[in-house]
Amino acid sequence: MSIEVNNESGVTVDEAQLVALARFVFERLYIHPQAELSILLVDEPAMEKLHLELMDEPGATDVLSVPMDELTPGTPDKPTPQGMLGDIAVCPQVAEVQARNAGHSTQDEMLLLTTHGILHLLGYDHADPEEKEEMFGLQRELLEGFTGKEAPSETMQ
Protein backbone atom coordinates (compact mmCIF):
# COMPACT_ATOMS: atom_id res chain seq x y z
CA MET A 1 0.00 0.00 0.00
CA SER A 2 1.14 3.48 -0.71
CA ILE A 3 0.51 5.93 2.10
CA GLU A 4 2.41 9.18 1.78
CA VAL A 5 2.62 12.06 4.24
CA ASN A 6 3.71 15.48 3.02
CA ASN A 7 4.24 17.87 5.93
CA GLU A 8 4.03 21.48 4.75
CA SER A 9 2.66 22.76 8.07
CA GLY A 10 5.90 23.80 9.75
CA VAL A 11 4.84 21.73 12.77
CA THR A 12 6.60 18.56 13.91
CA VAL A 13 4.14 15.66 13.70
CA ASP A 14 4.67 11.94 14.28
CA GLU A 15 4.21 11.07 10.62
CA ALA A 16 5.20 7.42 11.13
CA GLN A 17 2.32 7.00 13.56
CA LEU A 18 -0.13 8.52 11.05
CA VAL A 19 1.08 6.03 8.41
CA ALA A 20 0.80 3.14 10.89
CA LEU A 21 -2.74 4.24 11.75
CA ALA A 22 -3.72 4.43 8.08
CA ARG A 23 -2.32 0.92 7.50
CA PHE A 24 -4.29 -0.33 10.50
CA VAL A 25 -7.51 1.22 9.16
CA PHE A 26 -6.83 -0.22 5.69
CA GLU A 27 -6.40 -3.70 7.17
CA ARG A 28 -9.44 -3.48 9.44
CA LEU A 29 -11.70 -2.25 6.62
CA TYR A 30 -10.29 -4.65 4.01
CA ILE A 31 -8.88 -1.96 1.77
CA HIS A 32 -6.77 -3.35 -1.07
CA PRO A 33 -3.11 -3.48 -0.02
CA GLN A 34 -2.13 -1.49 -3.13
CA ALA A 35 -4.65 1.32 -2.50
CA GLU A 36 -3.09 4.78 -2.37
CA LEU A 37 -3.61 7.51 0.22
CA SER A 38 -2.01 10.93 0.50
CA ILE A 39 -1.98 12.82 3.80
CA LEU A 40 -1.10 16.50 3.47
CA LEU A 41 -0.31 18.47 6.62
CA VAL A 42 -0.82 22.18 6.02
CA ASP A 43 -0.72 25.44 7.96
CA GLU A 44 -3.79 27.57 8.63
CA PRO A 45 -3.51 29.88 5.59
CA ALA A 46 -3.17 26.88 3.25
CA MET A 47 -6.09 25.09 4.93
CA GLU A 48 -8.22 28.23 4.70
CA LYS A 49 -7.49 28.39 0.96
CA LEU A 50 -8.37 24.69 0.50
CA HIS A 51 -11.53 25.08 2.59
CA LEU A 52 -12.68 27.96 0.40
CA GLU A 53 -11.79 26.19 -2.87
CA LEU A 54 -13.27 22.79 -1.97
CA MET A 55 -16.19 23.64 0.33
CA ASP A 56 -16.82 27.31 -0.47
CA GLU A 57 -16.51 28.03 3.27
CA PRO A 58 -14.21 30.65 4.82
CA GLY A 59 -11.68 29.95 7.56
CA ALA A 60 -9.28 27.14 8.31
CA THR A 61 -10.79 23.79 9.24
CA ASP A 62 -9.33 20.69 10.88
CA VAL A 63 -9.51 18.08 8.10
CA LEU A 64 -10.64 17.91 4.47
CA SER A 65 -11.05 14.75 2.41
CA VAL A 66 -10.88 14.57 -1.37
CA PRO A 67 -11.90 11.10 -2.61
CA MET A 68 -10.53 9.88 -5.93
CA ASP A 69 -11.81 6.44 -6.95
CA GLU A 70 -14.88 6.32 -4.66
CA LEU A 71 -13.72 3.17 -2.89
CA THR A 72 -15.80 1.67 -0.08
CA PRO A 73 -14.84 -0.74 2.72
CA GLY A 74 -14.42 -4.34 1.66
CA THR A 75 -15.06 -7.66 3.38
CA PRO A 76 -12.74 -10.56 4.23
CA ASP A 77 -13.89 -12.37 1.06
CA LYS A 78 -13.93 -9.30 -1.16
CA PRO A 79 -11.45 -6.54 -0.36
CA THR A 80 -11.80 -3.12 -1.90
CA PRO A 81 -10.41 -3.04 -5.45
CA GLN A 82 -7.00 -1.50 -6.02
CA GLY A 83 -7.16 2.24 -6.61
CA MET A 84 -6.50 5.72 -5.36
CA LEU A 85 -8.45 6.26 -2.15
CA GLY A 86 -7.76 9.99 -2.18
CA ASP A 87 -6.20 12.86 -0.29
CA ILE A 88 -6.63 14.10 3.26
CA ALA A 89 -5.51 17.58 4.32
CA VAL A 90 -5.03 18.07 8.06
CA CYS A 91 -4.12 21.31 9.84
CA PRO A 92 -1.99 20.62 12.94
CA GLN A 93 -2.52 24.17 14.25
CA VAL A 94 -6.31 23.71 14.27
CA ALA A 95 -5.81 20.22 15.73
CA GLU A 96 -3.77 21.70 18.58
CA VAL A 97 -6.54 24.13 19.55
CA GLN A 98 -9.23 21.44 19.32
CA ALA A 99 -7.13 19.01 21.38
CA ARG A 100 -6.55 21.60 24.09
CA ASN A 101 -10.27 22.41 24.24
CA ALA A 102 -11.19 18.69 24.37
CA GLY A 103 -8.54 17.84 26.98
CA HIS A 104 -6.40 15.40 25.00
CA SER A 105 -3.04 15.53 23.24
CA THR A 106 -2.45 17.09 19.84
CA GLN A 107 -1.17 13.75 18.54
CA ASP A 108 -4.40 12.05 19.68
CA GLU A 109 -6.29 14.75 17.78
CA MET A 110 -4.14 14.14 14.70
CA LEU A 111 -4.99 10.42 14.89
CA LEU A 112 -8.68 11.27 15.30
CA LEU A 113 -8.66 13.62 12.31
CA THR A 114 -6.73 11.17 10.13
CA THR A 115 -9.21 8.39 10.92
CA HIS A 116 -12.10 10.78 10.30
CA GLY A 117 -10.63 11.80 6.96
CA ILE A 118 -10.11 8.20 5.83
CA LEU A 119 -13.70 7.33 6.72
CA HIS A 120 -14.94 10.26 4.64
CA LEU A 121 -12.84 8.98 1.71
CA LEU A 122 -14.63 5.64 2.09
CA GLY A 123 -18.05 7.26 1.82
CA TYR A 124 -18.95 7.68 5.49
CA ASP A 125 -20.64 10.91 6.53
CA HIS A 126 -22.24 12.49 9.59
CA ALA A 127 -24.90 14.72 8.03
CA ASP A 128 -27.76 13.05 9.88
CA PRO A 129 -27.94 11.39 13.33
CA GLU A 130 -27.91 7.79 12.02
CA GLU A 131 -24.90 8.43 9.76
CA LYS A 132 -23.12 10.24 12.58
CA GLU A 133 -23.71 7.36 15.00
CA GLU A 134 -22.35 4.84 12.49
CA MET A 135 -19.33 6.91 11.45
CA PHE A 136 -18.32 8.08 14.92
CA GLY A 137 -18.84 4.58 16.36
CA LEU A 138 -16.53 3.08 13.75
CA GLN A 139 -14.07 5.93 14.27
CA ARG A 140 -13.92 5.21 18.03
CA GLU A 141 -13.59 1.46 17.42
CA LEU A 142 -10.69 1.95 15.00
CA LEU A 143 -8.87 4.42 17.25
CA GLU A 144 -9.26 2.23 20.33
CA GLY A 145 -8.05 -0.79 18.37
CA PHE A 146 -5.01 1.12 17.14
CA THR A 147 -4.02 2.90 20.36
CA GLY A 148 -5.17 0.31 22.89
CA LYS A 149 -6.81 3.04 24.95
CA GLU A 150 -10.08 4.95 25.01
CA ALA A 151 -10.53 7.07 21.89
CA PRO A 152 -10.31 10.84 22.29
CA SER A 153 -13.62 12.66 22.32
CA GLU A 154 -14.82 13.83 18.92
CA THR A 155 -14.09 17.46 18.21
CA MET A 156 -15.97 17.67 14.94
CA GLN A 157 -19.71 18.03 14.51
UniProtKB/Swiss-Prot annotation:
Originating gene: ybeY
Keywords: Cytoplasm, Endonuclease, Hydrolase, Metal-binding, Nuclease, Ribosome biogenesis, rRNA processing, Zinc
Cofactor(s) in the UniProt record: Zn(2+)
InterPro entries according to UniProt: MetalPrtase_cat_dom_sf_prd, YbeY, YbeY_CS
One GO cellular component term noted in the UniProt record for this chain: cytoplasm
The organism of origin for this protein: Arthrobacter sp. (strain FB24)
Function as written in the Swiss-Prot or TrEMBL entry: Single strand-specific metallo-endoribonuclease involved in late-stage 70S ribosome quality control and in maturation of the 3' terminus of the 16S rRNA.
Main subcellular location of this protein, as a coarse class: cytoplasm
Molecular function as annotated in GO: metalloendopeptidase activity; RNA endonuclease activity; zinc ion binding
Record protein name field: Endoribonuclease YbeY
EC number(s) reported in the record: 3.1.-.-
PROSITE patterns linked to this entry: UPF0054 (PS01306)
